[in-house]
Regions:
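Gram-negative bacterial Sec-dependent N-terminal signal peptides
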Residues: 1-18
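Short loop/turn motifs that connect adjacent beta-strands in outer-membrane beta-barrel proteins
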Residues: 15-19, 62-70, 126-134, 199-204, ...
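A subset of solvent-exposed loop/turn segments in beta-rich extracellular surface proteins, enriched
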Residues: 17-183, 228-246, 265, 331-352
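Membrane-embedded beta-strand positions of outer-membrane beta-barrel proteins
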Residues: 21-25, 71-73, 134-138, 195, ...
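Short solvent-exposed loop/turn micro-motifs enriched in small/polar/acidic residues
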Residues: 55-57, 115-117, 190, 199, ...
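Residues on the lipid-exposed face of transmembrane beta-strands in outer-membrane beta-barrel proteins
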Residues: 58-66, 118-126, 193-199, 209, ...
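Loop-centered beta-sheet repeat module
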Residues: 153-226
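Outer membrane beta-barrel transmembrane domains
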Residues: 221-352
Length: 352
């Protein structure tokens, strides 16, 4: 527990018994095109499938709850990369120096959004009648890393080892990974709203809905940006004649006095039903990063806890989770072999 919350607990002895600590950790990594291991090594590897998404997200939160109120410290990282299938294919071919398809015209489209931020979250929860329960949380965030923008254009194959392109670029950043521009890091401040809702249809059926970043903006001061046309006029060739391109920019490099980075909502819903005895079923749904994800599973009550397994069809992944009293854990993966892993989720919570 951070020192602030420990000091708060000790300074309020009359309320200490009612203060309930909690910890939440969630992590997701997903790549549609190449294994996560290869994605971290600039896509170098033999495995490739056509796809349009990669993302990584991590959320750590710890704090205290007192009756209907709560306060916590949040630290988060989000990286969302979307691209056309043509973009993925060209990037993988060139990264591995594989033969390029003669006469091919690639439609290049990339959209990137990333933040690193931390801050304080205040939440309020209450019941709605006998069957419903809701929670609203507002987080004040200080951010110190950003990527926000995109690339569009076309690339034409000249021969099996060479190609050229004209690309329109418009993006804000903390580090210029495209042109190695040296800049001072911008500072960002903002907010994010988290909402949760639970409804008990009957003794055996329950609905849980959570929305992170229901409304979420980061306001960046003195934010570096690049806007213009990138061409392939500067080329180098290796000993085998395969091209390596250092883009040439014709356009603007500047500093925005203020820019707004908007974060998209991420939805999660779970509908669970208990059948006769210790058995049950559940249906799960996620909407995030322009993807609809569906999971279907079964539950088994064990003592005071519950074990469940779910199959997520889009990722072809299996989830195993365990909950007992205030403690919960789950892991989701599409492969057991680390070198082939394309989707992995981890979740750990106490007092959630």
């Amino acid at each position: 527990m951070p020192p602030f919350f420990l000091a708060l607990t000790l300074s309020l002895p009359s309320y200490a018994g009612a203060l309930k600590p909690y910890v939440i950790f969630d992590m997701q990594a997903h790549s549609e095109t190449v294994p996560i291991k290869d994605a971290m090594e600039d896509w170098e590897g033999n495995s490739f499938e056509r796809g349009e998404n990669q993302w990584v997200s991590a959320w750590f939160e710890t704090g205290l709850r007192y009756k209907r109120w709560g306060m916590g410290f949040v630290k988060r990282y989000d990286f969302d990369l979307r691209f056309s299938e043509d973009t993925a294919e060209l990037y993988w071919l060139s990264a591995n120096k594989n033969p390029l398809p003669l006469g091919r015209n690639f439609n290049v489209r990339i959209k990137a959004k990333a933040i690193k931020a931390s801050g304080l979250r205040v939440m309020f929860s209450d019941a709605l009648g006998q069957s419903a329960f809701y929670s609203l949380g507002l987080t004040y965030l200080k951010a110190h890393y950003t990527v926000d923008g995109g690339i569009t254009g076309f690339a034409d194959v000249i021969n099996e080892k060479d190609y050229e392109f004209d690309l329109l670029i418009d993006y804000h950043y903390t580090e210029d990974t495209l042109f190695d521009r040296v800049v001072e890091e911008p500072s960002g401040k903002g907010f994010a709203v988290v909402a949760e809702f639970n409804y008990q249809f009957a003794n055996a059926t329950q609905l849980h809905v959570q929305v992170r970043d229901l409304f979420a903006n980061i306001y960046w001061d003195e934010s570096p940006y690049t806007e213009g046309l990138a061409t392939s006029n500067r080329k180098e060739y290796d000993e085998n004649g395969y091209v390596s391109i250092k883009p040439v920019l014709s356009g603007f490099e500047g500093i925005d006095s203020q820019t707004v980075q908007r974060l998209e909502p991420r939805w999660f819903a779970q509908l669970s039903h208990t059948f006769a005895g210790p058995y049950g079923g559940l249906f799960q749904y996620r909407h995030q990063y322009e993807r609809h994800l569906f999971g279907l599973g079964a539950t088994l009550a064990v003592g005071e806890g519950e074990i469940s397994t779910s199959y997520w069809a889009v990722q072809n992944a299996l989830e195993i989770s365990w909950h007992c009293r205030r403690l919960g854990f789950s892991v989701t993966a599409d492969q057991l072999d680390e070198s082939d892993l394309k989707s992995i989720w981890l979740s750990l919570s106490y007092g959630r």
